[in-house]
Amino acid sequence: HLRLISNKIADNVSEKDCIFLIGEIGVGKTTFTRNFINYLQKQEGVEETEVLSPTFNLLYEYDIKNLKVMHYDLYRIKNNKELDQLGIFKEDLSAIKIIEWPELVETNLVNRLELHLKYSNKDSERELSITGHGKWKDINKNEL
């Protein structure tokens, strides 16, 4: 199910869009990102690459033909100075940004899609809620 949603979002995303992935460790944030990036690579006829969690690197970049995807993990960010050094929120950045742990920092990005993942009571199932802002404000999870 997460793969289908990541594919639908990938079909509708454009440069400068931002996807916030919110949820506990192991709930599926990096899995969503892997599905999203591999789907874009497949659509563009680019060889699929391994998509890892950027917990220790803070950032992995993926160039997919004329599209750039920047995958951030803010789990280890301690202050705004460290965040500024990453340059995530610079307006001139024309990449799609996927950000894990965005709730650890304050941001007011206009065009962002928030995916809230949490564990379900059922084994290995997850619950997903989606909130859109800016161009995504009218997003309906049932349409995905």
Where are these regions (language model features)?
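P-loop (Walker A) phosphate-binding loop of NTP-binding proteins
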Residues: E24
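N-terminal pre-Walker A segment at the start of P-loop NTPase domains
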Residues: H1-K8
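Phosphate-binding P-loop
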Residues: I9-K16
